[in-house]
């Protein structure tokens, strides 16, 4: 599946919820009618009652788009989650949360996950002192993630940190804003993640 390059708000409208694809400077409902489906007839169209399969597919698409993962990679995450002990759905969320681009976003070094990916791709991030330019890199407990010295002067990072202060602090991450570095203390528990994600629907979809 090709990378989506169209309007990000259109994706949010398709899923009917904020996917955190924009910086959050303004509330998403001030930018678009989130409850209105995209398309020519969106203004008067109602969201049709969906079949079980359609609900499962929509939830998978929502989760995949939220974390910025392509279909093939998302399926690999699911297979890895299924191999691990415990709940497959929770394992899937933990794998996604442990991605380096997500951790950089959670630490406030990128205003969106896409911006965090760009910072990583441009070799602006260190993990335990080593340069890592792979957004999907799996961060482990006690790993130290830092912005490379030459990237610290970027205004967008300062802006992202200001935005991050308005978000709920992630208890599993310790941040030193002055040094632009943080510690991934542990993998988050399911109760600490977004309650509106129905990962069980994703498991049902892939279990068929």
From Swiss-Prot:
Descriptive protein name: Small ribosomal subunit protein uS4
Record NCBIfam families: PRK05327.1, rpsD_bact
The gene coding this protein: rpsD
HAMAP family, per the entry: Ribosomal_uS4_B
InterPro entries the UniProt entry points to: Ribosomal_uS4 (IPR022801), Ribosomal_uS4_bac-type (IPR005709), Ribosomal_uS4_CS (IPR018079), Ribosomal_uS4_N (IPR001912), S4_RNA-bd (IPR002942), S4_RNA-bd_sf (IPR036986)
MF-aspect GO terms: rRNA binding; structural constituent of ribosome
Keyword hit for RNA-binding: yes
Pfam family, one: Ribosomal_S4
Keywords in alphabetical order: Ribonucleoprotein, Ribosomal protein, RNA-binding, rRNA-binding
Superkingdom field: Bacteria
Protein family: Belongs to the universal ribosomal protein uS4 family.
Source species: Nitrosococcus oceani (strain ATCC 19707 / BCRC 17464 / JCM 30415 / NCIMB 11848 / C-107)
């Amino acid at each position: 599946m090709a990378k989506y390059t169209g309007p990000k708000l259109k994706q949010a409208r398709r899923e009917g919820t904020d996917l955190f694809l924009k910086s959050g400077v303004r509330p998403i409902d001030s930018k678009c009618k989130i409850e209105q489906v995209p398309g020519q007839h969106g203004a008067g169209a109602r969201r049709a009652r969906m079949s079980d399969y359609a609900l499962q597919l929509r939830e998978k698409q929502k989760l995949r788009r939220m974390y910025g993962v392509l279909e093939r990679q998302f399926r690999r995450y699911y297979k890895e989650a299924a191999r691990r002990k415990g709940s497959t759905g929770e394992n899937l969320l933990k794998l996604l949360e442990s991605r380096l681009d997500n951790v950089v976003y959670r630490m406030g070094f990128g205003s969106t996950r896409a911006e965090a990916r760009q910072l990583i791709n441009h070799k602006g991030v260190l993990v335990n002192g080593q340069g890592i330019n792979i957004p999907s890199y799996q961060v482990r407990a006690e790993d130290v993630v830092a912005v490379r010295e030459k990237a610290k002067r970027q205004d967008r990072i300062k802006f992202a940190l200001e935005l991050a202060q308005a978000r709920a602090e992630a208890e599993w991450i310790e941040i030193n804003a002055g040094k632009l570095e943080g510690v991934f203390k542990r993998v988050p528990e399911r109760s600490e993640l977004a309650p509106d994600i129905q990962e069980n629907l994703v498991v049902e979809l892939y279990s068929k």
